[in-house]
Amino acid sequence: MAERLTIIDFVEKYVAKYSQNPFLWEKNLDTNQWEPTTYEETLAKAKRIAAGLMALGVQKGEKISYLSEGRDMWVIGELGVLYAGAVNVPLSIKLGETNDLVFRVKHSDSKYIITSKFQLAKIRAILPECPLVEKVIIFD
């Protein structure tokens, strides 16, 4: 039977193989140029985020809801959640109805929410209805 790789195994396998190759590309809005983040840089940033999450008290198996637009930090942050041993609960920015966000956060038993400054208003609006949420983390 073939070995089953976890996402972490997959990332580490390809970081070892392609460490200096671009993994992510993001447009710098100041220069209007696309800038790469290598596999190695992505892994290092993800591990720093994982360390930060663990320092905040995130425990293995805890749920973290994640609301952000598509960008490098979304990928890196999700990897950080996995490296911390937590479970990522992705939330779509297309969820315009407060009830949809509340439902997903409450029913996932998320104790933390990671968001961008652009989505923060949505999160602030639902916090009173999500008593299990202990912390909101803003990536910006």
What is the predicted function of each stretch?
Residues L95-I126:
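Conserved ATP-dependent adenylate/AMP-binding module captured primarily in the ANL superfamily
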